[in-house]
Amino acid sequence: MEARDVILRPVVTESSMADLDDKRYTFDVNVQATKTQVKKAIEEIFDVKVVKVNVMNVKGKLKRQGRYAGYTKKRRKAIVTLSSDSNEIKLFNDDQQ
């Protein structure tokens, strides 16, 4: 699996933004990706040193449209902890002109 196929998108929530101070970043990853694949992909894409990877599966939520019910897609989140001497990951453009 290619590195760009493993990491799908960053997760932007209040909790994940608070973790940025501790060099912990949250990403949605491929549901078949393992911890080692996530670690290698983050190190390859962002050129940083990963210390720890925590992975969790998120079940799909029940959604209704009138009398019809269905589920949203299941997903997998990875919380990546960087080493203290590693550079930060630039998730957003800070170029304010």
Curated annotation (Swiss-Prot):
Q: Example GO molecular function term?
A: rRNA binding
Key words of the record = Ribonucleoprotein, Ribosomal protein, RNA-binding, rRNA-binding
For this protein, the record's SUPFAM superfamilies field holds: Ribosomal proteins S24e, L23 and L15e
* Record's function text: One of the early assembly proteins it binds 23S rRNA. One of the proteins that surrounds the polypeptide exit tunnel on the outside of the ribosome. Forms the main docking site for trigger factor binding to the ribosome.
Specify the superkingdom: Bacteria
Q: Which PANTHER family match?
A: 60S RIBOSOMAL PROTEIN L23A
What's the subunit arrangement here? Part of the 50S ribosomal subunit. Contacts protein L29, and trigger factor when it is bound to the ribosome.
Q: Which GO terms describe its cellular component?
A: ribonucleoprotein complex; ribosome
UniProt xrefs under InterPro entries: Nucleotide-bd_a/b_plait_sf, Ribosomal_uL23-like, Ribosomal_uL23/eL15/eS24_sf, Ribosomal_uL23_CS
UniProt-recorded name of the protein: Large ribosomal subunit protein uL23
GO:BP terms for this protein? translation
Family membership noted in the UniProt record: Belongs to the universal ribosomal protein uL23 family.
Gene responsible for this protein: rplW
